[in-house]
Every structure is written in C-alpha cells, then in structure tokens.
Amino acid sequence: MKNKQHLISNRAFWAIFACFSFFYIRGLFTLIYGTDATIYASLSAEMMETKNWLQIFHKGNDYLDKPPLHFWLSAGSFSLFGVSSFAYKLPSFLFTLLGTYSTFRLGKLLYNTQVGKISSLLFYSSFAVILINQDVRTDTILVGIVVFSLWQLITYVQTSKWLNLILGFIGIGMAMLVKGPIGLMVPVLSLGIHFLVKKEWHNIFKWQWLVGILISILVISPMLWGLYHQFDLQPNKEFNLASGMEGKGTSGLKFYFWDQSFGRITGSNKEWKNDSSLFFFVHTFLWSFLPWSILGVFGLFKKIKESVLNRNKHEFYTLGAIVIPYLAMSKSQFQLPHYIYVFFPMWFILAGWYVYKLTETSTWYIVLRWIHVLLNFTFISVSVLVLTLFFPTKSIFMWLPIFTGMIGMTYLYKNYKGKIQLIYTTLLGFAIVMFVFSFHFLPQAVSFDGPYQAAVKSKEFRVNQLFSNNAQSLSFDIYADVNVTYKNVYQLQDYTNNGNYIFVNESQIADVLKTYEEKAVYEFNHHAATNLKLSFLLESSRSNTLEKFYLVEI
C-alpha cells in the first residue's frame, strides 16, 4: 500500500490527464448546442464580420447581457480557424487547461504537491468541467481565470512579488470581462475572509491593493467605454434585453455592475426570475461534482470543523471562496446550475486535502469506499443502458472500452489497496461513462438538432439567400454557408424564384405554403439537447417528442 505522501506518481498523473483529455478533445468537435452557446457563437461570428469590438450587437440589434471577453476570444478564433465548433470551443478549453494548472499550483501552495496533484485531477475529471467544455458558455473561461487569479494573489501575499500582484489583478479584470462582478467577488471574499479570521490586518491595508484595483480597471476600461457610449449616452434608445423585456432607459454601466449580478440576489432585477428553492444548488452540486461529490461534502465539513476548533493552523482562503458565494447564490431569485462552478476549483482543493488527510482505517474511509463501489457499478450500468436502451449500438468501438474497463477495475480492486484504490477505480469507472457520453450519447443527442440538419442540407444547393423568422434557430445561422437574413414570412414576395430558401418551424410552415408557391420542402426532426427527458431518451417514445423544422425553396 502506498503511503499518503506518494498517492499519485508523476507517471500516473500524466496517464490520467491524457485519458480524460480525449473527452475534451472530442468535445471540441461536437455540435454547438444550447440556447446560450448558439447565441454566443452567432454573436461572435457577427462581431468578427463587423469588426465592432466595443459595442455589442446581435443580428443588428443592441445586446446587453454578458460582458465581451468570451465574444472577443471566439471572434478571434473564428478569424483564425473559420466559423466552426472547434474554433468556438478552443479558447474555453485553453482556459480549462489554465484552470487545471492553477488548481495544482494553488493546492501545492496551500498544502503540498500531492494535494495539488489530487485536486487538479479531481477538477479535470469532474462532470461539471467536462460538461462546460461541451456546452460552452462564459463560465468555462471564468472558472479558469478566477482560480488563476487566486493562485497569483495568494502567492503575492506570501512572497510580496509585484509580478504576482499584477497577474492576479489582470486575472480579476479578465474575469469581470467575461462574467461581471462575480469575477471580483470570489477573490475578494477568499482573501478577505482569510485576513479577517486570521487577524492579518497588515494584509488588509496594503497600499499595493490600490495599484491592483487600478490594473483591473484598466483591463475592463474598453468594455466600460463601450457600455457608456452604446447605452448611457443614449438613454432613449429602444431595444430589448436578453429576456425580451424592453430595455429603454437602461444604463449599461448600472446593468453591468448591479442588475446583472447583485440585482438578482437582492430581487431588484425583475428581468430574470425562476423561483428556484434555497436547496437548488444542493442537488446541482451532487450531480455536477461527480464522481467526487461525497469527497467534496466530507472535505468541506471537515475543513469547517477543524477550522473552528483551531483556526490558527488552517487557511481560510478556500472556505472564503466557497461558503459566502454559495449562500448568496442560493438566495438569488434566478438560479442556473453553472453559477456555482466559479468556486469549484477551491472546493476540489478541499476534496484533495481531505483525501490526503484521510486515514485508511477510519470509519469514514470505509463508508467512502463502499459509496464509490456503488458509484462505479452505477457508472457501468448507465453506460450499458445508453448503449442498449437509449441509443442502441453494436459497435465494437463503443463496447470494447466498457469490457476493457471492467477488467481493469477488477485488476485495480485486486492489486491496489487503500486510498489509491479508491481514486484509481473511481477514475476508471467515470472514464467509462464519460467515454460513452462523449463519443456516443452526446453526438447522438445533438444529431436531433433540426436547425443544424437544415444548415447541412442547404450546402447541397446553389443557395442565393437564406431567410428565417425563427430567432431560436441560431445553429442554422452558425453552420450555414450563406448569411441568414431575418424577415417575416410575408415580407419575401420580392425574393421568390431566385434560389432563395426560408427556414421555419412547424407553427410557421402553413403560412409559408399558403403564401408562396414552393419548389421544394425539406423536413427535419428536432429535439433540444439541453432538454433530455426520459420520453426522448427511450427509443420507443422518442418520435412523440420531436418537433419539426422546414427548409423551403420559394
């Protein structure tokens, strides 16, 4: 049995990292799906074409929702590689690599090298991080930047090196450029709570923090300029917010600094509300932190218990970054699962610390071991279920990894003992289900994207112009070779008989067929990959859940 000082060797670390990297690389080429991701990709493509970097528009309309960094990076990537899934997702994946390395360095800084290794592997192999590299939103970049900022700033506190201070506040500025004030609040709460609990008054009142604040302001200044000129200087401008509410009179700066984040917590923002419960993020954590959810819970409560009993021996950076943001987000009137991912790296550090400290003869270790045996059985069962009941396949390419993995798991249970067995078997069990998820389940699910199918079909024709009046068909925009013009169905009389097509959903097809003498009609089945209910997953009932989209030559 390996002792706790050498739980994971360098060779094992890189082998595990390489294994899970296959899932990330596969995700780079998976279809862009989901409402947010398709909006962001479409907006980024428009930004690339218009070269309007500071004032943000979507389909020619003013856009006031997310800050611009994600769009800047995606637009830049589109310029280099063309508009594609790979180009859209690549910047986010690179920031995930930065987040993984930063988690390692921060875990090493706060504890030791082994905790750093364990924490970074837990982070990189977690469902949440893999998922947000498939369904790419602003949070993917945010997570990597925030943990990078914390690593740099905590290093600065310990070494007083200016470079770390500068990099830390550049990171905070970039985090604010990608998701707003939350990019500032998590680092501030992390350091602030630690300083207050440890009574490190000299660290609170460092004059160098003022320099750092100026650096962050400088980083976000292009965005502030754009918001001010696009909205605050034009208070009578008529536009709609992302929710569809009228935006006339909305201050861009106030929206950014208050409404978008704190307004949702206090209730002053009436734009977004989904009445989620105080416990919404409890079950969110349990599925998104997989396969390390129980380690995360045990690690958090052990850290709280030991910190209360002896605060002088413990750091409070991790608790500061987790507890207050978690409680504040739980009170928010609008909650989505990915909101809590911003402090997951710190939580993975606590989970890694807990594994390192865990005594293999303790009752808690025995409980953990049996829970993870059950988890591994569940992972394999789910994999088999997907391949037999949801999206049946006889492909040896899909089944071989499951059988090989089961043999490997038997070997690990037989030849390894203690915590190393728990870590390795769980990683292997989760790798099996993630292989099925990344290479079979998700590609099959997104293949039912009707707008994407229509875009692919349009490439078979000599298309002059493409039209649509369905604002939720943005994957059609992204993947079509011809720019899509949005017009009402009844506004196309001057565009008939010239190789033009209109893309509509089933509620609009009757109007098109009644108004125009169609030359060809192509029908596509559709189901949103972000709304996967059992009725869709079961092959026997799937046809009853499908919507229809149509591509019509007019």
What annotation goes with each model-predicted range?
Residues 2, 166, 302-483, 487-554:
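Membrane-embedded architecture of ER/inner-membrane glycosylation machinery
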Residues 1-365, 444, 528, 532-534, ...:
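Membrane-integral, polyisoprenol-dependent glycosyltransferases
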